[in-house]
Every structure is written in structure tokens, then in C-alpha cells.
Amino acid sequence: MALKTAEEFVQSLADLHLQIYLFGEQVDDYVNHPLIRPSINCIATTYELAAMPEYEDLMLAASHLTGKKVNRFTHIHQSTEDLAKKVKMQRLLGQKTGSCFQRCVGMDAINAVDSVTFEMDARLGTDYHRRFRNFMLRMQEEDWT
């Protein structure tokens, strides 16, 4: 699968057929609910900008696992340049959305887990890092949020 479009992201949420409650009331059309949709729109913006050539340098990165272009939110930082682009990307998204765009914690988490599993395997003889890398391959291939 290639990079997701904003529309594919929104449809992927609708396809989950989740049972969601807000303030004790079931929400049938959660994708279009007025309290939920603004957050969905902000996340969708991360996909929209990734598809725009003028933002490609900030929004995409070359995967160190495959060499393919991936959404920077699914990328493991490899250099100080990656970190600088991450910050510039976050500033851009903040300017475009005027809000939280919901993906920063996940990006920071995958980078931490990559490092920690590597160190755990070296110290404990476990196999977490290889398994995490396999997870990352799928995450990048399917452009998960």
C-alpha cells in the first residue's frame, strides 16, 4: 500500500464500526460527530500535507528499513536532520491546524520503543527488537496513524 490519503484515513475510521459513547450517549456516526470530527480533521491534515509536493521534504522520510518514502510520523529518526525536520513539520502542522494533530505521541513512542528494544535484546538476549522492526515494516507499509 502507498501513502494513505486523508480520505482513506477517514474511511478507515468509519470502517472500524466502533461502539462509542460520549457523555453516556451512544454515538452512531462518530466520524462526523461535532466533538470528534475536529480531531479527525487535524489527523487528516497530516495525510493531506504528506501528499503535497511542496511539503514532501518535511512530511516524508526515507525508511531506514526499506528505503521507501514513508510518512515522517512512521519513521525512526536516524539523524539530527531528521529531528530538525520533525520539529519543522510539527510547526507547519500547528500553523495549518491551529490544534493538536494527534500523532506526535505515537511518533515519539515508536522511536523510544525502537531504542529500548534494541538495548533490551543486547542485555537480556530477547527478540523484541526484531519483532518491533517487523511491526514497523507493517506500520510504514500501511501508513498507520
At which residue positions do the language-model features occur?
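Short, structured coil/loop segments at alpha-helix boundaries
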Residues: 26, 30-36, 52, 103-107, ...
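Short N-terminal amphipathic alpha-helices
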Residues: 47-62
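Glycine-rich flavin
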Residues: 61-145
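Generic short alpha-helical segment signal, independent of protein family or function
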Residues: 44, 48-51, 118, 140
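N-terminal-proximal low-complexity accessory segments that begin disordered
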Residues: 1-49
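N-terminal cap/leader regions of alpha/beta-hydrolase-fold enzymes
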Residues: 28-29, 36, 59-66
